[in-house]
């Protein structure tokens, strides 16, 4: 006997299926389900009178043969596709993406459910991989709370707290600070990795930081990013298979952008805030987007270009870089970095895939809780101003969605050598998953899983008779407590440090995971974001030309994902 359901009735019961479209928050972006791994008429759902019951959708298999958790009927949005599926989690990792149920009585089951399986209802929800923010100034530990609540589950950067150096530069300098920060990482339910200070013209001060646990090194102009320092730093990175991030020389004191590119010598490097408002060769650091060995990213205060972007940047810059507005030279330094033309071009370079990643620059000209929001605001603004991408159809924005989600998930993971652990929803990877109601997508997650365990969720009054009464707000869950914290998050270190036994020497509780394959990465490896245009910036007008085309757009006066969702 067959029961035919309308698409609306089916979506309300089991979530959208192949051919259904979902709007992302209040944007103009629509995603369309490309494939449904579940089987019509054999879907599993938990609840009274529902399918996942003993002898029905739940099998008799023992715990070793079933997942620890199944997320049912979820819409997965990832760089590799937009699909409807059940997601299996086992031992803190994604075990399978497919069809859950009881294989003894149901056809096509790839994920058996048993008495040892917990269920999270994913019907009507979107699931993304946890975000990865690769530009963190570790100024205050409270940033971690904000980042996690936004859907970020991995933070990479440097710092030691609100020291003057950390306020300006993402560096954890020296072995002593590196050890202390790695020990501090044990107290937070998030994956962490730290960059050492890369500014030295001799190798020994750099190598000792990698040996102490740094996942890479950061070159920052405030410490002197000279060609000699760049060359030395990249040589150490090549020797240790670690990444280098760079904030180039705004003042062009030690050379122009061409001098910096020459110092790279074709070696892989991650260029922070590549547009330049966050720092870098004025006015043409954007040129490096065309280099095969350069992995370019943006920071979020210029994302997207709005009528307020320029005005807020001057004060931010003066504070972050310890400048004095009463000193003419300091003011000129600040003003040289803030250019409406290059910020406008940055929008388009993201939309066309020339800028590969997006990060925060937390408390140092960036907002740690807004990486994901600003990524999707940029995508919306570009659709409104530029229309559909050539790869998309009139029905959906699937390719654009994949391009933008890759900017804060898989591409940062590839860049920093952690893609074997995090960055996408694929079997074998750490189960850092973010669940969203479509109306709140990119803004306020419903639930965040760390290593397969619920770490943060929207939760009502704990004294109420049910979970939903007000006040509903984010509350830490059991993955953040006791010994579970250290077993649901990772600390990334160098292979050199792992081999030297720093976990035991420092007394670390979290698992340490070495970064790997950092030095072979090229722009071509940046998924959906590998375009390498020939870029020029007019030194007088700051107009940006890419492959012969002028890149310009108007600032937005209103954005989605903003006042509709927030009081402040």
UniProtKB/Swiss-Prot annotation:
Species for this entry:
Burkholderia multivorans (strain ATCC 17616 / 249)
Which key words tag this protein in UniProt? Cytoplasm, Hydrolase, Metal-binding, Nickel
Give the protein's recorded name.
Urease subunit alpha
Any Gene Ontology CC annotation: cytoplasm
Taxonomic superkingdom: Bacteria
Q: Does the keyword Magnesium apply?
A: no
Q: Which residues carry this modification: N6-carboxylysine?
A: 218
Instruction: Provide the residue positions that the database annotates as binding Ni(2+) 1.
Output: 135, 137, 218, 361
Q: Where do the annotations place substrate binding?
A: 220
Keyword Transmembrane in the entry? The reply is no
Per the record, the GO terms for biological process are: urea catabolic process
Give the cofactor note.
Binds 2 nickel ions per subunit.
Question: Subunit arrangement?
Answer: Heterotrimer of UreA (gamma), UreB (beta) and UreC (alpha) subunits. Three heterotrimers associate to form the active enzyme.
Which cysteines pair up through disulfides? They are none
The record's subcellular location field reads: Cytoplasm
């Amino acid at each position: 006997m067959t029961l035919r359901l309308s698409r609306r009735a089916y979506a309300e019961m089991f979530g959208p299926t192949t051919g259904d479209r979902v709007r992302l928050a209040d944007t103009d972006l629509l995603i369309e389900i490309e494939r449904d791994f579940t089987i019509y008429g054999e879907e599993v759902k938990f609840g009274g009178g529902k399918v996942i019951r003993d002898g029905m959708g739940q099998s008799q298999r023992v715990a070793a043969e079933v997942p620890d958790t199944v997320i049912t009927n979820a819409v997965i949005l990832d760089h590799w596709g937009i699909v409807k599926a059940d997601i299996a989690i086992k031992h803190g990792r994604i075990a399978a993406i497919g069809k859950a149920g009881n294989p003894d009585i149901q056809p096509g089951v790839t994920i058996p459910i048993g008495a040892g399986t917990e269920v999270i209802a994913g019907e009507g929800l979107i699931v993304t991989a946890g975000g990865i923010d690769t530009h963190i100034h570790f100024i205050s530990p409270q940033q971690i709370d904000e980042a996690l609540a936004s859907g970020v589950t991995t933070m990479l950067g440097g710092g030691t707290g609100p020291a003057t150096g950390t306020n300006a530069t993402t560096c954890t300098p020296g072995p002593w600070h590196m050890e202390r920060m790695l020990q501090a990482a044990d107290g937070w339910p998030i994956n962490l990795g730290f960059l050492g200070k890369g500014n030295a013209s001799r190798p020994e001060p750099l190598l000792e930081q990698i040996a102490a646990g740094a996942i890479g090194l950061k070159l920052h102009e405030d410490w002197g990013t000279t060609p000699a320092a760049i060359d030395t730093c990249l040589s150490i990175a090549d020797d240790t298979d670690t990444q280098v991030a760079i904030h180039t020389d705004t003042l062009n004191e030690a050379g122009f952008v061409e001098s910096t590119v020459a110092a790279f010598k074709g070696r892989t490097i991650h260029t922070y805030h590549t547009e330049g408002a966050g720092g870098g060769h004025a006015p043409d650091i954007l040129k490096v987007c065309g280099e095969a060995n350069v992995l370019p990213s943006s920071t979020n205060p210029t994302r997207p270009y709005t009528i307020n972007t320029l005005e807020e940047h001057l004060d931010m810059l003066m504070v972050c870089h310890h400048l004095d507005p009463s000193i003419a030279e300091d003011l000129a330094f600040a003003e040289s970095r803030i250019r409406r033309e290059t910020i406008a071009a940055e929008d388009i370079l993201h939309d066309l895939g020339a800028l590969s990643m997006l990060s925060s620059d937390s408390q140092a000209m960036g907002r740690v809780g807004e990486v994901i929001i600003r990524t999707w605001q940029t995508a919306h603004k570009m659709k409104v101003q530029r229309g559909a991408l050539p790869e998309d159809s009139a029905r959906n924005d699937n390719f654009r969605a994949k391009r933008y989600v890759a900017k804060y998930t898989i591409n940062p993971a590839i860049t920093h050598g952690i893609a074997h652990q995090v960055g996408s929803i694929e079997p074998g990877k750490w189960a850092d998953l973010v669940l969203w109601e479509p109306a709140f997508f990119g803004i306020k997650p419903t639930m965040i899983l760390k290593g397969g365990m619920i770490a943060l969720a929207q939760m009502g009054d704990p004294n109420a008779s049910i979970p939903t009464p007000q006040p509903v707000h984010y509350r830490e869950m059991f993955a953040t407590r006791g010994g579970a914290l250290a077993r649901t998050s990772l600390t990334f270190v160098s292979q050199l440090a792992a081999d030297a036994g720093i976990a035991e020497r420092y007394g670390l509780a979290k698992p340490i995971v070495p970064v790997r394959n950092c030095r072979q990465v090229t722009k071509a490896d940046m998924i959906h974001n590998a375009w390498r245009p020939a870029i020029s910036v007019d030194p007088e007008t700051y107009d940006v030309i890419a492959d012969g085309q002028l890149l310009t757009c108007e600032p937005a006066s209103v954005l989605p994902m903003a006042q509709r969702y927030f009081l402040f």
